[in-house]
């Protein structure tokens, strides 16, 4: 049994105040380790193992939230693996295959590990945010926030129509991430100018610079700020497309939309500021500059649209047109032809 005041711990100021057992399994003991704002308590069926440079064990782990100076989030697990390295001033905590680390009072769970130091808490792995997942090799945690310089972000399909519908409705990689559980907002920026965003259920992908995820509204705003005008030989100024259909029957239908909003529950993409879509030899301009994309790449009909045919010579112009776009070279329309 430890003397009053405890045993010196690895030649540091830390003390161990409990029973130490010496056997063929080495030095072992039961009790708890208090480190910064965390407590690691051995389970009834487990013991700490005292190694030459560290203490390891399966514990009931709690990290209490702290909002002043260096911030720490609330984390807990009733069964986690810890490694305490006093001379490095670090406590490492890792989830078990059957037990994730619970963050932010149940708002998210981490399948991976964290490091607690006086400078703060970092980690890596997969964060399950209930409706979304965030994957990174280097998370930084604060009282209410998750940050990552490089991350992948997915939004789950919460209400699939059938077993064949994709389990994800939104996916992007290589973005910076800032998620605030206080503001109920996630903000993401591309690390490479533009990031590819996949919409598996809509059978589309787009290229965008930045995104904002409104957690409670289940919506995400997207913006493309880096699009440049491209001049082709015929002298027509075109903006490079950033929305592309992946539907096998639409022949890579594509168009430019610098802004869009995605409704996660409805699985609908609302594209804004769409000047035109080139279909076959026609240039079709929606009067609202809006394009609505539903599941399986279905585009809502345009009302009161303008059609130029062909779009190089602009010889024929139709207005007040109702247009149904079916594929890159296939559309059906009716309208007025002034002459």
Which ranges hold each PLM region?
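Structural signature for solvent-exposed beta-strand/loop edge elements and short helix-capping sites
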Residues: 1-339
């Amino acid at each position: 049994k430890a003397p009053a005041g405890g045993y010196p711990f690895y030649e540091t100021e830390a003390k161990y105040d409990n029973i130490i057992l010496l056997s063929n399994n080495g030095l072992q003991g039961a009790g708890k380790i208090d480190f910064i704002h965390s407590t690691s308590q051995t389970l009834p069926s487990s013991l700490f193992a005292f190694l030459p440079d560290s203490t390891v064990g399966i514990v009931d782990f709690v990290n209490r939230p702290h909002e002043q100076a260096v911030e720490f989030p609330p984390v807990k697990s009733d069964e986690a693996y810890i490694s305490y390295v006093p001379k490095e001033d670090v406590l490492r905590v890792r989830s078990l295959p059957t037990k994730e680390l619970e963050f932010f009072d149940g708002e998210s769970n981490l399948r991976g590990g964290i490091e607690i130091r006086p400078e703060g808490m970092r980690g890596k792995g997969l964060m399950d945010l209930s409706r979304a997942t965030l994957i990174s090799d280097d998370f930084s945690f604060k009282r209410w926030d998750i940050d990552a310089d490089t991350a992948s972000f997915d939004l789950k399909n919460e209400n699939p129509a059938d077993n064949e519908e994709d389990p994800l409705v939104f996916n992007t990689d290589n973005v910076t991430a800032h998620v605030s559980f206080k503001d109920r907002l996630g903000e993401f920026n591309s690390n490479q100018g533009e990031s590819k965003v996949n919409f598996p259920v809509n059978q589309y992908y787009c290229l965008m610079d930045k995104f904002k995820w409104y957690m409670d509204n289940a919506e995400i705003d997207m913006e493309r700020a880096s699009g440049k005008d491209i001049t082709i030989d015929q002298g027509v100024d075109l903006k490079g497309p950033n929305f592309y259909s992946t539907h096998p029957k639409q022949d890579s239908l594509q168009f430019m939309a610098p802004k869009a909003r995605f409704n996660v529950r409805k699985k609908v993409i609302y594209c804004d500021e769409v000047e035109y879509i080139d279909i076959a030899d026609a240039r079709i301009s929606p009067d609202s500059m809006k394009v609505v994309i539903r599941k399986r790449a279905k585009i809502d009909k345009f009302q009161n649209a303008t059609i130029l045919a062909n779009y190089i010579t602009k010889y024929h112009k139709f207005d007040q047109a109702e247009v149904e776009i079916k594929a890159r070279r296939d559309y059906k329309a009716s309208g007025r032809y002034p002459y």
